Amino acid sequence: MEQTYQYAWIIPFVPLPVPMLIGVGLLLFPTATKNLRRMWAFPSILLLSIVMIFSINLSIQQIDSSCIYQYVWSWTINNDFSLEFGYLIDPLTSIMSMLITTVGIMVLIYSDNYMAHDQGYLRFFASMSFFSTSMLGLVTSSNLIQIYIFWELVGMCSYLLIGFWFTRPLAANACQKAFVTNRVGDFGLLLGILGFYWITGSFEFRDLFEILNNFISKNEVNSSFGTLCAALLFTGAVAKSAQFPLHVWLPDAMEGPTPISALIHAATMVAAGIFLVARLLPLFIVIPYIMNFISFIGIITVLLGATLALAQKDIKRGLAYSTMSQLGYMMLALGMGSYRSALFHLITHAYSKALLFLGSGSIIHSMETIVGYSPDKSQNMVLMGGLRKHVPITQISFLLGTLSLCGIPPLACFWSKDEILNDSWLYSPIFAIIAWSTAGLTAFYMFRIYLLTFEGHLNVHFQNYSGKQNTPFYSISLWGKGDSKRINKNFRLLKMNNSKSSSFFSKKPYRSGKNVRNRVGPFLTIVHFENQKSYSYPYESDNTMLFPLLVLGILTLFVGSLGIPFNQELDILTKWLTPSINLLHQKWNDSIDWYEFWKDASFSVSIAYFGIFIASFLYKPIYSSFPNFFLINLFVKTGPKRSLWDKILNGLYNWSYNRAYIDAFYTTSLTGAVRGLAQVTHFFDRRVIDGITNGVGVMSFFVGEGIKYVGGGRISSYLFFYLSCVSIFLLGLYFPVF
């Protein structure tokens, strides 16, 4: 066992050879490396599988012994300062390593097929492997300096993957938005690290916790300054985990490929903020007010994320706001001091959300058959519907993830979310009411996504939902370029090559470039109905994409058992996290009162079923061929006057669809102010700074010209200069001014 911990330092570096070899290969042998690009998926998956096996071994040992191991290498620069680097193995590290590796492997297997026809295949796998390396380095770090280094590397990888299709303006803007927003949090994190180093003189977690605890108990540190430093540390987690008010980058990050959305939302970037707060929780507990602040930010994010997801039409943006809300639950649990329930929900949510995002990728992949490679259309739930008949395996897996996130037993998220909801009553009744209400909203918007996607009829063939079929086709490449081409509707077989692809629903022409996926075999199959109209339909994804859905579906079914006690013994998660922090349950019993548990659980399940019922009532098409796409459609009156209720619903829809106008507020206030400041700075630089510099140059020129004539060797110039000086002297002597 000791040897296992001694060699744990290699965990972050095992996936690193893949991006290094890809970079060297592209530099020295670019043609051969590109021709053999598909082979790089195997070493990426293999190396991450080795880390997963190692992490499983560590986790088993942690469950059996609950030991904490830390190894440190010290580099002494002088007698007063030394740099220490090392790694820390504890229950939190083993849990995060398991999440990163298991979800990462599933995403890599999925991506091999999803990204097979993309020209950036090599760049994608290099970035993904380096992403795994950075995240594994973050969770094994033993001090704040290492945390910050890997924190920045995780951010860098996420920016590279969010802006993966950088020729698309929306993707480039999303990358910049994520970068700028996270700069705010990262700057606060850096200031907080420096502040605590100034207080304690150490970056090591153990030393930091012990010294700060002693200082606070003896009242040797300014509490206001300590609270400020803790709030700055928390700012980094707020930005990384998309908590209010630094959440605005998360929905725009959906411009990246769907597999990276799954990895970011399940086990890497947004989980990094939760990990940081969990790692520093012993520090936050001893500082006044900071725990209340964490729970306050968490509950706001819970409610805001759920309400913003209500009216989204983009399937990935809806799931993104769902992630934001669920991360708010985790942050709320950490702020309440319920360490176990926060990590439990982190585990269950990771597998459920990875399943949902990979399922959405399969849906998008199938919709691209019809609408082309246009994210505005392939991700638009308005154009979907009736996919249950065409992608049954994807539908079943997506339904599992949806029910899990809704909190339906016995799926994973039911067990973890129910713990957080019950703990919220012990912490604050107001927070509990908001948390329980949001549980109903979660069930509503998740089933709304499911119903709009899989139930009813395929709506892409109809324009404005009135039954009018579009006749022209258009295409748009994966890189944002497109080409218009009219195609005979009676063709039974359509094929796509490098420069042509086809789609329904738009009359807008696009010009096609060369960056289009190559696909072998028929592109569209046109089915003739009785009215002799031509249609095409989605198809199920390949087995390589369905296998990760199967594995994640099984995990979603059974991972909740980690937190269920059997035979009056401690559950696996409690053994795993022993000793852990739990401020709400100071006297934790080994046994559980199942009667009390099911009594509390029945209320949360009832709320979830109520949300599902409302969503089914509003969005499931029963009598009409088309579902009601907007929340207000059932309440719109034909008369000239609209009731107050209609106006409220319309305002709620607009508020949700427009992201609560927070982005608009930032644009008008912060962006406008920064632009105005930049213009003032530009004017000052050009007119004042450059004016002084240019003025000195012009003055030097004229002075030089004057000296040149004085000392030019001409007697007349000397006499003129001499007589002028004498005249000025005499005038000053005989006609004094004062």
UniProtKB/Swiss-Prot annotation:
Gene Ontology CC: one annotated term: chloroplast thylakoid membrane
Keyword Plastid in annotation: yes
Reaction(s) this enzyme catalyzes, per UniProt: a plastoquinone + NADH + (n+1) H(+)(in) = a plastoquinol + NAD(+) + n H(+)(out); a plastoquinone + NADPH + (n+1) H(+)(in) = a plastoquinol + NADP(+) + n H(+)(out)
Intracellular or extracellular location(s): Plastid, Chloroplast thylakoid membrane
Family annotation (InterPro entries): NADH_UbQ_OxRdtase_chlpt_su5_C, NADHpl_OxRdtase_5_subgr, ND/Mrp_TM, NU5C-like, Proton_antipo_N
Keywords from the UniProt entry: Chloroplast, Membrane, NAD, NADP, Plastid, Plastoquinone, Quinone, Thylakoid, Translocase, Transmembrane, Transmembrane helix, Transport
E.C. number: 7.1.1.-
Enzyme superclass (EC): translocase
Family: Belongs to the complex I subunit 5 family.
Subunit relationships: NDH is composed of at least 16 different subunits, 5 of which are encoded in the nucleus.
Role summary: NDH shuttles electrons from NAD(P)H:plastoquinone, via FMN and iron-sulfur (Fe-S) centers, to quinones in the photosynthetic chain and possibly in a chloroplast respiratory chain. The immediate electron acceptor for the enzyme in this species is believed to be plastoquinone. Couples the redox reaction to proton translocation, and thus conserves the redox energy in a proton gradient.
Protein known as: NAD(P)H-quinone oxidoreductase subunit 5, chloroplastic
Organism, as annotated: Ligustrum vulgare (Common privet)
